């Protein structure tokens, strides 16, 4: 059986691959990628820690050009800051904060590749110590308003840390994917659900 990891894509100078844009550890760049392969706090078993590597591998299949918008990404500088080792739990949160402290001073945009969505809290709180001026858009079937430190709680933890609910937009919230008790409709006052 032939898998993508064993298959070598042909080289074509007229088809620049997205993966070739990313240079490791540039001191300054327009966009920086960082892997945050968290998975141990997931409510259900997961292999989410494999996602950063899978995304990087998938970039080998994509070009740099968005034809519908006529935008070529080759004009931007991309860098890869690598993966944050063992990002789970309180010690992992400290490692995330250490790695991301001041990162937006050198990189215009940071793309954090999870892991499970527990990284939302660690990454947002590392980048924005004052959450009162931050907005959050989630793409998820779940509200993520559970108690505790799991992949089901990052939005609630951010609200408790100072993120105003009115600054949150949740896209994809599904019926039968959340409990009435964890909807926390009065406490969270989420700005918009789509």
Identify what each model region corresponds to.
Residues 2-192:
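Conserved alpha-helical scaffold segments that buttress catalytic/binding sites
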């Amino acid at each position: 059986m032939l898998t993508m990891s064993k298959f070598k894509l042909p080289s074509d100078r007229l088809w620049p691959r997205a993966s070739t844009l990313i240079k490791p550890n540039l001191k300054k760049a327009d966009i920086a990628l960082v892997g945050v392969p968290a998975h141990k706090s997931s409510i259900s078993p997961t292999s989410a820690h494999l996602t950063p590597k899978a995304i990087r591998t998938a970039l080998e299949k994509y070009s740099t050009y968005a034809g519908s918008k006529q935008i070529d990404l080759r004009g931007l500088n991309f860098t890869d800051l690598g993966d944050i080792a063992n990002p789970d739990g309180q010690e992992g949160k400290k490692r995330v904060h250490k790695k991301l402290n001041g990162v937006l001073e050198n990189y215009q945009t940071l793309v954090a590749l999870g892991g499970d969505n527990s990284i939302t809290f660690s990454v947002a709180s590392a980048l924005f110590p004052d959450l009162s001026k931050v907005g959050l858009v989630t793409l998820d079937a779940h509200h993520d308003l559970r108690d505790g430190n799991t992949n089901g709680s990052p939005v609630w933890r951010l609200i408790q840390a100072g993120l105003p609910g009115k600054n949150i937009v949740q896209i994809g919230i599904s019926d039968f994917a959340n409990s009435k008790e964890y909807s926390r409709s009065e406490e969270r006052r989420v700005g918009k659900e789509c």
